[in-house]
């Protein structure tokens, strides 16, 4: 059967002084804006490609004025481009034995997991950690990278975790980050 790597989380940027941005980045400078109109776009996650041997889709960018968080990278599909993961805010995991996950964007997210065995798919990267690598000869999908907790809204909420890796036969899929 066919499997895929997990999708990467969308880019995570934070200006709350006691917290960090994704990918190990420091807190960003707060934005001070004048009264006026601003373009705000909430980027969607990558759409499911459906049944069959179709490439997964990247997430869309989120935009606030001049600030852009990059959409998450798609997970690799074993029959397309040797299963490589795609770059994004956080990188997609991969499927197959090419050992090439997608990269995250600096100060937004981490890479997807790595795999040389050709077994289960690796997890997508998260804001707080890379997707989990796959051990040799494993047919189990690995976990997505952890997100980051933020208390900017009052209560602590974890955001931007990576998607778990899929499996190519009777193995078990990985958990989300």
Task: Indicate residue ranges for each PLM-predicted region.
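Low-complexity, glycine/proline-biased repetitive segments and flexible coils/loops
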Residues: 1-177
């Amino acid at each position: 059967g066919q499997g895929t790597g997990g999708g990467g989380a969308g880019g995570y940027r934070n200006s709350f002084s006691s917290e960090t941005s994704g990918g190990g980045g420091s807190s960003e400078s707060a934005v001070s804006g004048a009264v006026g109109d601003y373009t705000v776009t909430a980027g969607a996650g990558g759409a499911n490609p459906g049944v069959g041997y179709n490439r997964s889709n990247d997430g869309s960018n989120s935009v606030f004025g001049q600030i852009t968080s990059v959409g998450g990278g798609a997970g690799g599909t074993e029959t397309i481009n040797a299963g490589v993961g795609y770059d994004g805010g956080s990188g997609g995991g991969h499927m197959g034995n090419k050992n090439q996950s997608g990269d995250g964007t600096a100060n937004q997210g981490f890479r997807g997991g790595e795999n040389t065995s050709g077994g289960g798919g690796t997890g997508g990267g998260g804001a707080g950690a890379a997707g989990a690598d796959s051990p040799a000869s494993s047919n189990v999908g690995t976990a997505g990278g952890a997100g980051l907790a933020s208390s900017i809204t009052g209560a602590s909420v974890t955001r931007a975790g990576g998607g778990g890796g899929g499996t190519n036969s009777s193995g078990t899929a990985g958990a989300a980050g």
